[in-house]
Design a protein with these regions (language model features):
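Metallo-beta-lactamase
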Residues: 2-125, 156-227, 246-252, 309-331, 335-339
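Cap/insert and terminal regions of metallo-dependent hydrolase folds
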Residues: 12, 17-19, 26, 126, ...
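Divalent metal-coordination and catalytic microenvironments
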Residues: 89, 99, 136, 143, ...
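Active-site metal-binding loops of divalent metal-dependent hydrolases
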Residues: 100-102, 137, 195-196, 227-229, ...
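Acidic/histidine-rich helix-loop elements
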Residues: 102-119, 198-205, 256-270
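Active-site metal-binding motif and surrounding structural segment of the metallo-beta-lactamase
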Residues: 111-158, 243-249
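A short acidic, amphipathic alpha-helical/loop segment
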Residues: 145-150, 169, 234-238
């Protein structure tokens, strides 16, 4: 009876997203994968080959210009898109990098989808980084080659639970559970918040590491950098608890897996452009940046469809077209041009 009571007490104290076997799950009430889904790598790879790689001339800023803009803005607060979910975010004296991926492939070793657009600059050309944020362990976000060769291993690393083991040679590694926070310095605080996603890198490690969104608070402003996420009711709750948000970064690509999934343009774990706008509305976000597109083919929608739908749907969700922001790869924008 004593052991039973101890076990019951532990269960009562365990957060909902912590399972007894040590794995994690999405917030209560989140959507589940459709039981009619029939995933096939063979079919997916056949369909993926049909996706046309047609890149507009203005999609990418030349590398030399990117380096010039970064140098010119080294004393300003800015945001720069390196590609996919990799951004440089300069806030005061702190330079942040998000989900850095500089490899050619988004998979193990030399496997996985190849990016059709290289990073805006090379890894050895990035400015000194003070804060490294990692949202989850999927290969298009956690790139071990980049982590091993990262030139600023003294930077503070903040990541979800059980991901610290990948950063053995780093000096300041901090794992967070949902709703835990770290004060980075006098100006910046980072909180890990729930997302609707999952984790996996191998055959036997599904959901053994946590995933999450980052809320960055800086001089009275709130910036939310989203993990890959699907839509869920959790975002209304987060909007009520933490909103309004000044600026949200959110995935708008990698949503069409039909015919493996029963519904076209719908993914449980990746928002389509309209769902991304709905999440931003739920968060009471003033502005939103669409990311996770235009870099590598991870799904079957046309590669330039996400930004078009994102802009086209903005007003329906309460945003002006100017407040639904699309970057060019390599583009550098001053923060005060985006949020005041």
């Amino acid at each position: 009876i004593l052991f039973f009571n101890i076990e019951l007490t532990a269960m009562e104290k365990r957060p909902y997203h912590h399972l007894p076997d040590g794995t994690f799950r999405n917030p209560e009430g989140s959507p589940e994968r459709d039981p009619n889904a029939k995933w096939s790598y063979k079919i997916f790879n056949e369909e993926r080959k049909k996706v046309k790689i047609e890149i507009p001339n203005d999609h990418v800023i030349p590398r030399v210009e990117v380096l010039e803009e970064l140098k010119k803005n080294e004393n300003n607060d800015y945001i720069a898109w390196i590609g996919h979910a990799t951004f440089l975010i300069k806030l005061g004296n702190t330079t942040i990098i998000t989900d850095p991926v500089f490899s050619k492939n988004t998979g193990p070793l030399i496997f996985g989808p190849k990016r059709y657009i290289p990073p805006a600059i090379n890894l050895n050309e990035i400015p000194p980084v003070d804060l490294f944020l990692l949202t989850h362990n999927h290969y298009d976000h956690q790139d071990m080659s980049t982590i091993r060769n990262f030139p600023y291993k003294k930077s503070k690393v903040i990541l979800p639970l059980k991901l610290g083991k990948y950063f053995r040679n780093y000096k300041d590694v901090n794992e967070l559970d949902w709703y835990q926070e770290i004060k980075v310095n006098e100006d910046i605080k980072v909180t890990l918040l729930p997302a609707v996603h999952w984790s996996r890198r191998g055959l036997f490690d599904i959901n053994k590491t946590l995933w999450g969104n980052f809320l960055i608070e800086y001089k009275g402003k709130k910036i939310l950098f989203a993990c890959d996420t699907g839509y869920g009711n959790i975002y209304k709750d987060l909007g009520n608890k933490f909103g309004p948000i000044d600026l949200t970064f959110i995935n708008i690509g990698a949503y069409n897996f039909y015919p493996m999934m029963p519904v076209k343009d719908k993914s449980v774990y990746h928002t389509n452009p309209e769902e991304a706008l709905q999440i931003s509305k739920d968060l009471k976000s003033k502005k939103v940046i669409g990311m996770h597109w235009g870099t590598v083919v991870l799904s079957l929608e046309p590669i330039m469809e996400p930004p078009k739908r994102f802009k086209a749907g903005a007003e329906k969700y309460g945003f002006s077209k100017d407040d639904a922001i699309i970057f060019k790869i390599g583009e550098v924008k001053k923060l005060n041009q985006i949020i005041n």
